[in-house]
Amino acid sequence: MQLSIEEVKKLDSNSYQIIDIRSEEEVAHGAIKGALNIQAGEIESDERVPHDKKLVIVCSRGKTSVDVAEYLTEKGFDAASLKGGYISWLLDAMKEDEVAERDIK
């Protein structure tokens, strides 16, 4: 299952957790606020991962996260991939900033 940025934004903020599976080096250059950076193979065993929330899995472009979300769903998690990955999230944030700047002028 994939969720668009718009779908994620519509979710109750207490109902999901973003899991960023990108490398620490990639995350050092930017990350989604509140996301947990956990490598794909460690999600099941990481104590920070809530079992009572939807997991929104994020990779760079939204490809690897699809496989990880499917695997986690098979293991009993409520998981989905962020469509387009971090790059899509970043582009959306840049668009929002542009709109805000236009509204200020």
Predicted regions and their residues:
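Short, surface-exposed ligand- or partner-binding patches at beta-edge/loop junctions that are enriched
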Residues: V58
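Rhodanese-like catalytic fold shared by cysteine-dependent sulfurtransferases
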Residues: M1-Q17, E24-K54, K63-K105
